[in-house]
């Protein structure tokens, strides 16, 4: 009846319409996800009337229907894509729960005395937030698919979280009194970049709601926005291209694309487990303290466990851990220092030793049970990176502790018991390596201790950790190269392994860029904030670029220009100068020609 050409055009039109409809639904999902976050921020951030609550609830109901009927339409329009997704069964459960919410709405739905309404309210928020996170995480993969540079995707994701956090902190229910946008932006940047520098008192400025926002910003910034969103995207979507996986592989510094999802899962799992155990230990240490000192001990423990493991340095106490009644709790200081070390040592190192322990324990179990099974033998379970990090970390901790003790024994450590001197010295060697907590008055330290702290801040933590700085591996490679230059040796060999020249070039680039930024930022701050001394400004800038959070009582003196410079420095320190510049500068293709060599006098 119809010609072949007509049927072809008709089928082509149907495919185009179906594709356009599915694309429109996805756009609606993204808009609904953003609307969910906005409505939740409005409901929890403002004191709204009953009429306002009714409008908010109606808005949530509309969003529920968009997600529900949009998902149903997608299933009918493109069933293959749905059933191929890894997390399709979770989405089906969520759809069923959304249908339950829709069907259980009653005329008394807006009554605050209705238990069903309260249940619906909580369930609605949890479900909508869960779905919104899934769909917004998909945007990360979409960005990679559209050939946006992975470095810039990393940068944009941090910018988005920082701006979102700033607006959330400005909500009326998030703070007491007035809070300017620049102060909110500075605090949000400090939290997301896990720095800890503050221009306002966290304890007195922010309400519990505001401190919860800070906690979430620290957590997201600590594990990395890309880590979190990539895990969600890879969990629920299978349509990730080779380029997507290569981009994630480079961001995570993985040797194989097969390990991407496992690395993401282990990172999140390790973070949750360590922080949960740490929170319980911290609660146990403070359980007998007066409620007037710490009203909510559980929240204190959770907040400081997350802040310590993420190397953020934020505290809910005025004066940080130097607060009266807390400064003498040496057990608490040691446990917080342990969390800082675990967070700053790097996830690959934790995984490396986890693999070693698993290997040893399982082989021991097989021997004890008489089994002939054995774990496959690995030549080097503990790789070179792990050996460098562990060695450098031990040297910095032991050396830093001894030098601080020697320098401050007759100053800030005077009058303390032996265990107090040891605890304070150890903590003061740990915290400059990007944590930012303080158990002493930094302004009372001797100049020699300031410069020791400055050096520890600049070196920082280890690669792929929650800490900042130029990293322990970078300084190790640079020092090894200096030694080789003095000895006239070309090859860089560490722990019986030869390092590629790319490692050496990158290490020197990181060091040079760090010094250039510190020098430039110090000059700019000195120009705009002339009230500060050179030592204060240099200390502040180094603390910001290394995402530490220690200050010689200078942060509160910053004016608007100074806050912007330090905020930018914190941001650059978190995303990395190499990462930022690699994303901004166009890459040059390799050339097939070679110039003649000529020595230059150095």
Q: PLM features: residue spans?
A:
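Membrane-proximal intracellular helices of multi-pass ion channels
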Residues: 1-602
């Amino acid at each position: 009846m119809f010609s072949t050409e007509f049927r072809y055009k008709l089928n082509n039109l149907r495919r185009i319409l179906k594709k356009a409809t599915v694309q429109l639904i996805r756009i609606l999902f993204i808009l609904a996800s953003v609307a969910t976050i906005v409505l939740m921020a409005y409901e929890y951030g403002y004191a709204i009337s009953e009429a306002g609550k009714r409008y908010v609830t109606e808005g949530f109901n509309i969003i529920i229907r968009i997600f529900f009927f949009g998902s149903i339409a997608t299933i009918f329009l493109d069933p293959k894509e749905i059933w191929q997704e890894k997390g399709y069964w979770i989405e089906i459960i969520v759809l069923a729960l959304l249908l339950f919410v829709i069907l259980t709405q009653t005329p008394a739905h807006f009554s605050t005395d209705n238990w069903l309404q309260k249940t619906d309210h909580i369930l609605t928020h949890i479900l909508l937030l869960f779905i919104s996170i899934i769909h917004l995480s998909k945007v990360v993969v979409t960005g990679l698919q559209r050939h946006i540079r992975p470095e810039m995707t990393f940068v944009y994701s941090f910018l988005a979280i920082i701006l979102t956090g700033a607006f959330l902190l400005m909500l009326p229910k998030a703070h007491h009194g007035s809070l300017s946008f620049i102060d909110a932006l500075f605090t949000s940047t400090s939290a997301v970049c896990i720095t800890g520098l503050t221009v306002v008192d966290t304890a007195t400025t922010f309400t519990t709601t505001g401190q919860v926002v800070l906690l979430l910003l620290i957590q997201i910034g600590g594990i990395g926005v890309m880590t979190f969103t990539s895990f969600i995207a890879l969990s629920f979507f299978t349509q990730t291209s080779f380029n997507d996986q290569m981009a994630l592989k480079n961001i995570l510094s993985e040797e194989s694309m097969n390990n991407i999802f496992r690395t993401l899962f282990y990172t999140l799992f390790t973070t949750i487990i360590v922080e949960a155990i740490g929170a319980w230990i911290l609660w146990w240490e403070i359980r007998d303290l007066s409620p007037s000192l710490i009203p909510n001990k559980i929240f204190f423990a959770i907040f400081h466990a997350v802040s310590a493991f993420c190397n953020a340095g934020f505290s809910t106490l005025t004066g940080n851990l130097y607060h009266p009644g807390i400064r003498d709790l040496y057990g608490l200081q040691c446990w917080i220092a342990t969390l800082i070390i675990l967070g700053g040592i790097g996830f690959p190192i934790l995984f490396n030793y986890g693999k070693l322990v698993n290997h040893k324990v399982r082989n021991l179990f097989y021997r004890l049970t008489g089994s002939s099974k054995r774990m496959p033998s690995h030549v080097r379970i503990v790789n070179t990176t792990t050996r460098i990090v562990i060695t450098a970390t031990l040297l910095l901790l032991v050396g830093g502790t001894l030098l601080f003790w020697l320098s401050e024994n007759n100053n800030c450590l005077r009058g303390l018991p032996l265990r107090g001197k040891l605890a304070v010295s150890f903590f003061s060697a740990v915290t400059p390596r990007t944590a930012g907590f303080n158990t002493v008055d930094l302004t009372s330290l001797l100049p020699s201790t300031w410069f020791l702290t400055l050096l520890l801040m600049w070196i920082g933590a280890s690669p792929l950790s929650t800490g900042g700085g130029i990293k322990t591996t970078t300084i190790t490679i640079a020092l090894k190269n200096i030694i080789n230059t003095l000895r006239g040796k070309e090859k860089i060999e560490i722990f019986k392994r030869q390092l590629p020249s790319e490692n050496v070039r990158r290490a020197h680039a990181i060091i040079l860029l760090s010094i250039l930024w510190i020098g430039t930022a110090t000059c700019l701050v000195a120009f705009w904030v002339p009230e500060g001394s050179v030592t204060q400004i240099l200390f502040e800038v180094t603390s910001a670029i290394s995402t530490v959070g220690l200050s010689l009582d200078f942060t509160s003196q910053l004016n608007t220009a100074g806050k912007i410079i330090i905020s930018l420095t914190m941001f650059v320190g978190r995303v990395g100068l190499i990462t930022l510049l690699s994303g901004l500068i166009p890459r040059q293709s390799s050339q097939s020609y070679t110039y003649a060599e000529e020595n230059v006098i150095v």
